[in-house]
Amino acid sequence: PTALTLAHNNDSYAQEIHHYFHRKSFRVYYSNDFIGVQLAGAMKNVIAIAVGVSDGLGFGANARAALITRGLKEMQKLGSAFSAKEKTFMGLTGLGDLLLTATDNQSRNRRFGLALGEGISSVDAINKIGQVVEGRFNAEQICSLGKKKQIELPICHIVSQIIAEKITATDAVNFLLDRPATYE
C-alpha cells in the first residue's frame, strides 16, 4: 500500500479528483496548501542529500535523526514565509516523504548524497546514479528563496555548496557543527 497527497487550491476540485484515484492500497489525501506541498516536495530532496552525505561519511543514526529533524524545521520556516500551512510539513507531503526519501536506498537523492559523502564528485555521482536527481537542482533554488525571504537555511545552504564543490563534505560537517547553539 502507499499514500500520497493531491494538492489543488480549489478544495471541491481536489475532493472530486481524489475520488478517481483513492483505493484500498492507494490512499489519496487532498490539500489546498498548494505552496506548502510544492515546497515540501522540493526541500525534502535537499535534506535527503544531506542525510546521504552524513551516512556516506560514516555517521550513524543520531546524525541522521538530527539532520531529518533540523531539515524539517528548515522546511517549516521557509514554508511559513510563503504562507504555507505548518500541518502540511507534518503530514505525508512533508515528514512522510522526507523520511522515505532520506532513508530509503532506492532514493536517488539519498544515493547522490551517499556518493558525495564518500568523496565522489557531483558529476561522477550523477553518472553513477544514471537518473535525474531533483535535489541537485532544488538546493540552489531553495537557497535563493531563503535569501529572498531573509531566512537562514544552513542545511540547504551547505548541501548547495557541496554539490557545487565549493566545500568538501567533511568541511561541511564542521561548518554545521561549529554553528552556535540556538533555542529549539
Region locations from a protein language model:
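Internal alpha-helical scaffold of NAD(P)-dependent oxidoreductase catalytic cores
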Residues: 1-88
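NAD(P)-dependent Rossmann-like dehydrogenase/reductase catalytic/cofactor-binding core
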Residues: 31, 44, 51-55, 59, ...
